[in-house]
UniProtKB/Swiss-Prot annotation:
One Gene Ontology CC term in the entry: extracellular space
Gene: RNASE2
Catalytic activity, EC: 4.6.1.18
Organism, as annotated: Gorilla gorilla gorilla (Western lowland gorilla)
Cross-referenced Pfam families: RnaseA
Protein name: Non-secretory ribonuclease
Length: 161
């Protein structure tokens, strides 16, 4: 009885730890709206090299993000995808606010190769260019801080396919 209960408690703690890690990956810096944070993470590739481009994101999050995808398109083009038919989000089946791009776009996927928890400026990334479809989650804009020309805006890059 005791070993079974102990094992169950360990499994529960591991599950809660994984949920905490997963939840922390979707936290935006307070100075951004969700749409602004989407644009920063997935549209505004500040350098053609992942290592340099990821420094911007890592500095806001104060950690080395494991991976990130930059869509080589405009924010306006992604906003247009928000007008495509709604679908269930692949990463969260309870969300129905996702939209398929309908056409492939060039993108760069950055993958952390050299973590550096003590100094995030030393994190290094490999990059993989590709042409792929993507699925994006969209929500109504933040009335106070997002530009009024887009009533519905992208807030999460759910999947690349």
């Amino acid at each position: 009885m005791v070993p079974k209960l102990f094992t169950s408690q360990i499994c529960l703690l591991l599950l809660l730890g994984l949920l905490a890690v997963e939840g922390s990956l979707h936290v935006k810096p307070p100075q951004f709206t969700w749409a602004q944070w989407f644009e920063t993470q997935h549209i505004n590739m500040t350098s053609q090299q992942c290592t340099n481009a990821m420094r911007v994101i890592n500095n806001y999050q104060r950690r080395c993000k494991n991976q990130n995808t930059f869509l080589l398109t405009t924010f306006a083009n992604v906003v247009n995808v928000c007008g495509n038919p709604n679908m269930t989000c692949p990463s969260n089946k309870t969300r129905k606010n996702c939209h398929h791009s309908g056409s492939q776009v060039p993108l760069i996927h950055c993958n952390l190769t050299t973590p550096s928890p003590q100094n995030i400026s030393n994190c290094r990334y490999a990059q993989t260019p590709a042409n792929m479809f993507y699925i994006v989650a969209c929500d109504n804009r933040d009335q106070r801080r997002d530009p009024p020309q887009y009533p519905v805006v992208p807030v999460h890059l759910d999947r690349i396919i």
